[in-house]
Amino acid sequence: MRRYLAVRGGAGDVAEPDLNAKPQDNLYLAVNSEWLSKAEIPADQTSAGVNTELDIKIEKRMMKDFADIASGKEKMPDIRDFDKAIALYKIAKNFDKRDAEKANPIQNDLQKILDLINFDKFKDNATELFMGPYALPFVFDVDADMKNTDFNVLHFGGPSTFLPDTTTYKTPEAKKLLDILEKQSINLLEMAGIGKEEARVYVQNALAFDQKLSKVVKSTEEWSDYAAIYNPVSLTEFLAKFKSFDMADFLKTILPEKVERVIVMEPRFLDHADELINPANFDEIKGWMLVKYINSVAKYLSQDFRAAAFPFNQAISGTPELPSQIKQAYRLANGAFDEAVGIFYGKKYFGEEAKHDVEDMIHNMLKVYEQRINDNNWLSEDTKKKAIIKLRALVLKIGYPEKIEKIYDLLQIDPERSLYENEAQMATVRTKYMLDKLTQPVDRSVWLMPGNLNNACYDPQRNDLTFPAGILQAPFYDIHQSRGANYGGIGATIGHEVSHAFDNSGAKFDEHGNMNNWWTDEDFAEFNKRVGQMVDIFDGLQYGPAKINGKQVVGENIADLAGLACAVQAGKNDNVDLKDLFENYARSWMQKQRPEAIKTEVQVDVHAPQPTRVNIPVQCQDDFYTAFDVKPDDGMWLDPEDRITIW
């Protein structure tokens, strides 16, 4: 066992406050313990912390704006398709109408599943079901070809399981969670007009099919290997896997043109597809579709349905209360028209001065990154040159998009129809839009995140960075706070996203976003050795009631490590106070979570829990030891040979 395993992450438990903690022993607790000792988690949230507070701040602003615009107190902004968001919001917040409608809006669509009396009927109606608001026991998507990202291709995979991850089925909580889902689903089906005994049989069949799925679909750890989703097979080879279901006929009816090949995201699922999708399993498939359907649509119905669909989510998240009705109305409208809403937010709350300042910081960080690549002591010159070509090709998307994606023009809201009917109609439009992309080149101008989102991302297939206006505010960024604090906040975030271009997944893609090996064999072997060190230092780390899977979170941890290293270097170039930088970095990950939420996050998220993302990256920065005079006997000490450097 390596020495650092005793002290990785500092002394103490970052899930518990320690008012006596010193930065030399546990930076995260030294900075955040006072807040942790007093913080209360909102009743409708899974956590409290910097990110939650920022999410709530954005949401409160937008909810007031929506209320004022919907009431006529404020005029409708001149933003394309924003009026549709307000129209949907008005429908969603009318709970008098929703409560009066009860289960009526879903009866026709529910009946379409109930009318499936055998496997032949399922096959005959599969196209209509796929285009509607239903889950089928397989998934198709259209996205860029990883090896030629100018073109879209058809992707195939398995459906999601009832529990958050395949690993959840092996935990002591699995039976309790499935029992809650069983009771909830029977109740919902009864509320929709199905007899109790009939509902019970449907749900038991659904649970049986879900167990079969859980053995063949990918876990979160497997999904974290991004390049492993690229498994192209010929159409002939793909169709040969389906003996019982007429996949050839199905694809003819849903696709705008014939495809020559399919990208199989889950080869194991495809190998078992015929064992799952066949006449012998029909009753289980039908039950599974009903349970998926009723649990997904309950949120569009009455308050009674909303409440009846809450226990399973409550058990997974620990959240004691449903979001308020008005909050749900805003969230549904924002979710359906997020790009228009994000443009509204960006134009109103994100100033040009701030945008230019952030752009300046990003360009500074890119210069630092290039210098760090040049100074790298384990890469060959050939690989360095190619890494810099990729770095210089990065496309920046800051604040909010200038144009709205075409899909929002196609979505229509009918104020005379129910909330469910509007949502179902939009689901059909989105599915058709997705399939139609097969005949079109990849649109690289599309944003993956709306302007009002508190987040940021790197897209390996477009080689672009997105920094929405939502994250470009305190404590991550404030034009009035110290430059050191800004580098510890948004600077580290910028470095983090840039580093995704060179993490264990991004490193396999070139400057055009194509999966293409631009490394020498020797360099890639050394890179993978360092990736392995990153896996080891996090693997098994205890956080509250859960242990971290180092392999599952390694890509994000590489980005954290390299992002902070770049922020420190950029800060030094600007002569900032490094204590400010490290302390704001620790503050930016401040969080208090419910135990249930921790367990679920560790199972399903490729990010380590936020508090665990502070001390280990900091421990690997030599400048931290100088800034805080850290000694070998201190809890934050790592021996120099155990400090990991990748970029």
From Swiss-Prot:
The keyword Glycosyltransferase does not apply. Transmembrane segments: none annotated. It is an enzyme of class 3 (hydrolase). The active site is at E497, D560 (proton donor). Keywords: Hydrolase, Metal-binding, Metalloprotease, Protease, Zinc. Its EC number is 3.4.24.-. GO terms for biological process: protein processing. PROSITE patterns: NEPRILYSIN, ZINC_PROTEASE. Its cofactor is Zn(2+). InterPro entries: MetalloPept_cat_dom_sf (IPR024079), Peptidase_M13 (IPR000718), Peptidase_M13_C (IPR018497), Peptidase_M13_dom_2 (IPR042089), Peptidase_M13_N (IPR008753). GO terms for molecular function: metal ion binding; metalloendopeptidase activity. This is Neutral endopeptidase. It comes from Lactobacillus helveticus. The lineage of its organism: Bacteria, Bacillati, Bacillota, Bacilli, Lactobacillales. The gene is pepO.
